[in-house]
């Protein structure tokens, strides 16, 4: 790497296909500029329809809408499901057509981030959690006081390192589990150097780390004395809808090797997040 470090990942650096297809060559101005499905799928579908160039139109889909293409393709449902999981980004919710900045739910976030876990063996996405993740589980039988999200409460960085993991991501909502949700934030743990891990907290509004997450971060210092903790103080978000997108973008930048210090030096806009929705979710 040269002396100038990247501060952000550009939209053009993020594949519109499943991220494990990052090596796929895209030729602008051709059908392949929006193609994620393999040629063999197009050949199979085109046997009973018009030529490739008119395939989307003949099936009643807009050009490049490969989820729509599979909906109407003469293929077995199990094959369609497999193709979606292997090649395509998660499907863009229909409600976004009328409300393009609709709040992300936990499933939207989980579906996107789990694809990165599939694409990058050294990365694990631990999950999407409420702020009371460490509270006793109210649904536990016999009144046992067990952590609501045990996988997070029991997270051991050294164990993860020995499993081959070098980055761990997670997203939190600042509401407890019994409420409807208020604001998404993210945590990323860099364990490339297990002797000096870096745990960084990101809030798109730049607010202080909530006490429960701060306590979790301090717990990693108890595991590894030289663990470094950090948070962003810069405000990125100025609207009220894109906190989930900002949280995912932060983790994606960390996965791409952007340093936390560089990432926090300047912000990206809410409009950038709206454009990113069109990349991370497809039709």
Q: Residue ranges of each PLM-predicted region?
A:
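Contiguous terminal or domain-adjacent regions
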Residues: 250-283
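Cysteine protease catalytic domains with a Cys-His-Asp triad
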Residues: 1-185, 191-199
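Generic alpha-helical secondary structure signal
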Residues: 107-110, 211-214, 270-274
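Residues that form generic nucleotide/phosphate-binding pockets
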Residues: 112-116, 215-220, 279
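Cysteine protease-like catalytic core of ubiquitin/ubiquitin-like
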Residues: 158, 162-262
């Amino acid at each position: 790497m040269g002396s100038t470090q990247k501060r952000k990942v550009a939209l053009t650096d993020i594949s519109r296909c499943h991220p494990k297809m990052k090596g796929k060559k895209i030729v602008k101005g051709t059908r392949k500029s929006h193609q994620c499905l393999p040629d063999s799928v197009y050949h199979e579908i085109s046997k009973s329809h018009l030529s490739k160039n008119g395939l989307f139109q003949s099936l009643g889909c807009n050009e490049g809408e490969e989820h729509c293409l599979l909906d109407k393709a003469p293929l077995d449902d199990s094959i369609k499901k497999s193709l979606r999981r292997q090649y395509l980004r998660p499907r863009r919710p229909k409600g976004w057509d009328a409300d393009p900045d609709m709040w992300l739910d936990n499933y939207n976030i989980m579906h996107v981030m789990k694809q990165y876990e599939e694409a990058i063996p050294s990365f694990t996405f631990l999950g999407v959690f409420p702020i009371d993740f460490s509270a006793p589980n109210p649904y536990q039988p016999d009144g046992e006081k067990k952590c609501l999200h045990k996988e997070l409460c029991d997270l051991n960085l050294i164990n993860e390192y020995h499993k081959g993991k070098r980055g761990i991501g997670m997203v939190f909502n600042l509401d407890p589990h019994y409420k409807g949700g208020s604001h998404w934030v993210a945590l990323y743990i860099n364990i490339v150097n297990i002797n000096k891990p870096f745990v960084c907290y990101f809030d798109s509004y730049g607010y202080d780390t909530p006490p429960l997450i701060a306590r979790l971060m301090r717990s990693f210092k108890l595991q590894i004395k030289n663990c470094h903790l950090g948070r962003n103080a810069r405000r990125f978000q100025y609207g009220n809808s894109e906190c989930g997108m900002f949280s995912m973008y932060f983790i994606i930048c960390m996965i791409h090797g952007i340093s936390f210090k560089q990432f926090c030096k300047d912000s990206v806009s809410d409009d950038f997040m709206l454009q990113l929705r069109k990349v991370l979710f497809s039709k």
